[in-house]
């Protein structure tokens, strides 16, 4: 195994970390209706907590309205309660076997809370990226101890690990900044 192999093993994990962050922030409200807004909602169904996607279909009706088509009519009230209790600031209204979810405009205070939440998710992702860099450096040091690479190669590998970290931290910061702008846009 070489230093390059170690880097090739770590980089996909860093990409996956950014993808996880991207998925996480899609569930943060921005004032516009998106189906991913309800991704974290869990419904008490058939004696267990199930993701909303497994009890109904979510669609965007217009810029400020989501429609949830519940497949089992007996689950409408439980689904409505789950959306209301999800702490998203939404007020669902049942209409037969469907639930209309109006997306109210965000207050300045709520926008700031969502920006903080975005930054928290970003910080968690930064920690994950740094842990991956640490793992890469440890793997490189193990290679040096096993005499598989020279000290110069080890030092270059450490520099490569730092460069990789900076590349992905910059991408992460760009994603955070874009989401903050999206949240704060009125």
From Swiss-Prot:
Keyword hit for Secreted: no
GO molecular function: ribosomal large subunit binding
Keywords: Cytoplasm, Protein biosynthesis
Main localization category: cytoplasm
One of the protein's GO biological processes: translational termination
One GO cellular component term: cytoplasm
Keyword S-adenosyl-L-methionine carried by entry: no
Subcellular location field: Cytoplasm
Cited CDD domains: RRF (cd00520)
Pfam families hit by this protein: RRF
Family to which this protein belongs: Belongs to the RRF family.
Function: Responsible for the release of ribosomes from messenger RNA at the termination of protein biosynthesis. May increase the efficiency of translation by recycling ribosomes from one round of translation to another.
PANTHER family linked: MITOCHONDRIAL RIBOSOME RECYCLING FACTOR PSEUDO 1, RIBOSOME RECYCLING FACTOR
Entry protein name: Ribosome-recycling factor
Species: Chlorobium chlorochromatii (strain CaD3)
Gene (UniProt): frr
């Amino acid at each position: 195994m070489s230093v390059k192999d170690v880097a090739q093993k770590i980089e996909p994990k860093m990409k996956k970390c950014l993808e996880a962050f991207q998925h996480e922030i899609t569930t943060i409200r921005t004032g516009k209706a998106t189906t991913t807004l309800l991704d974290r909602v869990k419904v008490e169904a058939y004696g267990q907590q199930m993701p909303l996607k497994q009890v109904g279909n979510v669609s965007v009706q217009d810029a400020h309205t989501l429609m949830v088509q519940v497949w089992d009519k007996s689950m409408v009230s439980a689904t409505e309660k789950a959306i209301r209790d999800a702490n998203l600031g939404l007020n669902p209204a049942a209409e037969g076997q469907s639930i209309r979810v109006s997306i109210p405009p965000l207050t300045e205070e709520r926008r700031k809370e969502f920006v903080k939440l975005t930054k928290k998710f970003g910080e968690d992702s930064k920690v994950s990226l740094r842990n991956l860099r640490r793992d890469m450096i440890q793997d490189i040091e193990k290679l040096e101890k096993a005499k598989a690479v020279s000290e110069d190669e080890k030092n270059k590998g450490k520099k490569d690990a730092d460069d990789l970290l900076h590349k992905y931290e910059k991408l992460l910061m760009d994603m955070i900044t874009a989401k903050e702008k999206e949240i704060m846009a009125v």
